[in-house]
Amino acid sequence: MKKGDILEGIVTRVDFPNRGIVEAEIPAEGAGAAKTDGEKAGEAGNTEPAKVTVIVKNTIPGQKLRFSIAKKRGDRLEGRLLETLAASELEKAEDVCPHFGECGGCLYQTMTGKAQLSMKEAQIHRLFRDVCPDLHFEGMFDSPLLQEYRNKMEFTFGDAYKDGPMALGMHRRGSFYDIVTADGCRIVHPDFNKVLSATKDYFEAQGTPFFHRTMHTGYLRHLLVRRAQKTGEMLACLVTTTQMEKEAEEALLAGWKDCLLALPLEGRLAGILHTKNDSVADAVKDEGTEVLSGSPVIHEELLGLTFEITPFSFFQTNSLGAEVLYGKVREYALEQLEEKPEVIFDLYSGTGTIAQILAPVAKKVVGVEIVEEAVLAARKNADLNGLSNCEFIAGDVLKVVDDLAEKPDLIILDPPRDGIHPKAIGKIIAFGVKRIVYVSCKPTSLVRDLEILQNAGYRVERTCCVNMFPSTSGIETVCLLERR
C-alpha cells in the first residue's frame, strides 16, 4: 500500500467531525503493509483479499466510494475522495440546495434530519464511551428550523475559477481560491440571497474589480449580511480595500445603497454599512466602518431578552437554536437548587448572553472574556435589558481568576473550540464549587477536559446535545457536573 493507490470501499461510520471510516478490500499482492488475521497480506500462502481501514473526510455512512491513498502514517491511512459510486440509504432528503456538492458550507444536506441526529448522537456516544462509560445522555435536541436558520453569512468576492467571471458566495469545496455564487443557499432566509444577487449584479454592471488574494489588488472583498430571526432586522456590510479614489468610491457606494433599498425584502434593512480592510489575510477585519444608510446595529431577542448586534459581534448564528441551547444551560444550572446562587461565574462569556439569561436568578453574575469588544457589547446589552447585577471583565480566564474576590456558587464554562487551558482548568477546580455547567462546540475538546474534571472529583450527571447547525458537522454539547 502506498500513496496514490486507488481503492473502493464502503463508509461504515463517520466520526466527529467529518471523518468517514471506510472499509476497503485490496488484492493480497497489492496489500503491502495492510494486515489481515495477524499476517501481512501478500506473504506466501495468503491469497485472500486484505481488508484495510481508511479515513476519508466529508462522507456519509453507507456511501460506496472511490478514493486514493493520500497519507500513510504507520497503520493509519487517509484517503482523498475521487468519486461517490453509490449513494447511502440515508440520503433521502428532498429539496436539496442547488449548490450542494460544490459549496464547502454543508456536508449532510442529502441526509434526512432524523438520520443526521442519529449519526451525531452515535458520534457523541463513541467519544464519551471511555471517559463517561455510565453517561446519562438525554438526547440530541434539534434546531427548530432545519433550513433558513442562520442569522449571519460572510460571502466572499472572487472568481468562479482561475481567470473566470466574478462570483460572490462561498468557497468551493476543497479550494482556497474558487468561489461558488451561493444565491440559492437553503440555510439562510431568502432575503440573504436577494441581497447577495443584487450586490453581485450591481458591481458586475459597474465593472468593479474584486480583490485578488494572490496579487493583493482589487476592491471588493466580502459581503457580510445579518438578519435577526425574531425581529427581521437586517444589516448589509460591504468590505473593501482602499484601492479606489474617494470621489469614485462615494458614487459607487451610493449606487449600491440605492440598489439594496429598492429590494422587496420580507425583513427590514435596518442598516447598510461599508468597512475598509487592507489586511493581506482572507478574513473580515474592521479597519474602519461607515454607515451608508440607517443604523449600525440590529436587535435580536433570546428567551425574553434583547441583544444589540453589530456586523462583527460574536452572537450565536442560529437564534432559535440558541434558545434551545441556553434553555438547557439554564435548566442544568438551576436543577434542584435549594436556594438561588449568590454568585455565578460565566467564564469565557463572549457577549454575555448566558450571564444575562441567568442574572434574574442570582445576586451577581461575573463574566470573564478575553475579547474586549465582546465585553463592551456584554455591558451594553446588560444595560439594555435593565440588568444591574452583571459584571463583565476583559481578560484571560487563566489570569483573571487569580484576582476575583468573590467565591462562586456555580460556574458556567463556554470556552473556545479548543477547550480550556490546562493551567486554567486547575484554577477553576480550586474554587471547589459544587456545580459546573460546561457548554462546548467541540466535543473532542470537551471529553479531554471532562477527564480532568472527573479526576478532580466531579461527576457528569446529565448531558445533552443541540443540533445547532443542521446539514453541517457541528454539535453543541451541554454537561452538568457535580462534585462528589
Predicted regions span which residues?
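Rossmann-like S-adenosyl-L-methionine
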Residues: 2-3, 8, 13-16, 25-26, ...
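Internal alpha/beta scaffold segment
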Residues: 177-221, 242-273
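Carbohydrate-binding surface patches
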Residues: 224-228, 233-246
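Short, conserved phosphate/pyrophosphate- and ester-handling motifs at nucleotide-, phospho-/glycolipid
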Residues: 62, 188, 318
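Short, acidic/hydrophobic/Gly-rich beta-strand patch recurrent on exposed beta strands
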Residues: 20-26, 169-172, 237-239, 378
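Extended interfacial segments that mediate partner engagement and assembly in macromolecular machines
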Residues: 85-95, 101-210, 230
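Terminal RNA-binding accessory module
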Residues: 1-95, 99, 173, 391, ...
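Short, solvent-exposed loop/turn elements at beta->coil junctions and helix N-caps
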Residues: 139-146, 213, 222, 226, ...
